[in-house]
Swiss-Prot record:
<feature type="transmembrane region" description="Helical">
    <location>
        <begin position="231"/>
        <end position="251"/>
    </location>
</feature>
<dbReference type="GO" id="GO:0005886">
    <property type="term" value="C:plasma membrane"/>
</dbReference>
<keyword id="KW-1003">Cell membrane</keyword>
<keyword id="KW-1133">Transmembrane helix</keyword>
<dbReference type="InterPro" id="IPR011397">
    <property type="entry name" value="YhfC"/>
</dbReference>
<feature type="transmembrane region" description="Helical">
    <location>
        <begin position="70"/>
        <end position="90"/>
    </location>
</feature>
<feature type="transmembrane region" description="Helical">
    <location>
        <begin position="8"/>
        <end position="28"/>
    </location>
</feature>
<keyword id="KW-0812">Transmembrane</keyword>
<protein>
    <recommendedName>
        <fullName>Uncharacterized membrane protein YhfC</fullName>
    </recommendedName>
</protein>
<feature type="transmembrane region" description="Helical">
    <location>
        <begin position="38"/>
        <end position="58"/>
    </location>
</feature>
<keyword id="KW-0472">Membrane</keyword>
<dbReference type="Pfam" id="PF10086">
    <property type="entry name" value="YhfC"/>
</dbReference>
<feature type="transmembrane region" description="Helical">
    <location>
        <begin position="121"/>
        <end position="141"/>
    </location>
</feature>
<feature type="transmembrane region" description="Helical">
    <location>
        <begin position="176"/>
        <end position="196"/>
    </location>
</feature>
<feature type="transmembrane region" description="Helical">
    <location>
        <begin position="204"/>
        <end position="224"/>
    </location>
</feature>
Amino acid sequence: MVSQEAVVFLALSGAIAFLLPIGLIVWFKRKYGASLKVFFIGALTFFVFAQLLEGGVHVYVLQVNEMTKEAMQHPLWYGIYGCLMAGIFEECGRYLMMRFFMKRHHTWADGLAFGAGHGGLEAILITGLSSISLIVYAFAINSGTFEQLLVNGDVKQALLPIQEQLLHTPSYEWMLGGIERISAIAVQIGLSLLVLYAVKNRRPLFLLYSILLHALFNVPAVLYQRGIIEHAAAVEIIVALIAALSVYWIVKAKRVFQ
């Protein structure tokens, strides 16, 4: 049986993923006059550059090309690749969209809106939708209907690890996904302001800074995936510290854009 606590924490994580981006853009619009158009440009940027383009490269490098697939088995190469690819695609995408589609939107509030849209769609796709599917699987396990989903070998291979996760993961860990999204959105807003500064002041060197900082933010998650960091809570503590620095920059950046 999947515990009630696990289901509750999954629901809370999903709620954070869906409601936080909406709450942020409503707040930013009411208090700072942020643009809904910029919010949706930020969301589109994540979808195109992270989900489609970066995702396509990952399929080729990690699955199709045998040489790179084998090379990525080494933790060092996988770590470097994973961290840098996210930074390159998302930050270059941010720069291009701001440069060509936000020519009249270079204010501090625009940076807030873009980051909320970018990080918001990321939260919905990564944590929100997965929380919903996991809750559905949890109810199926508890009602005894999960086995009916295992119609063939491929489905079993995909679903049995999910069943193991739901049954054996400590309940509190399901809440970490929602907490991580809070930190991630803060970082995405901070990076959006950094890239917008690069665009506004024609200082592309700050794009390089954003790529490196984005890569740094991804290091704890990659180390956890490879088993170098053993506890998920440790990852979230590190990520929260990075998010706190991002919030400090977000507040200070208001003067920079005046």
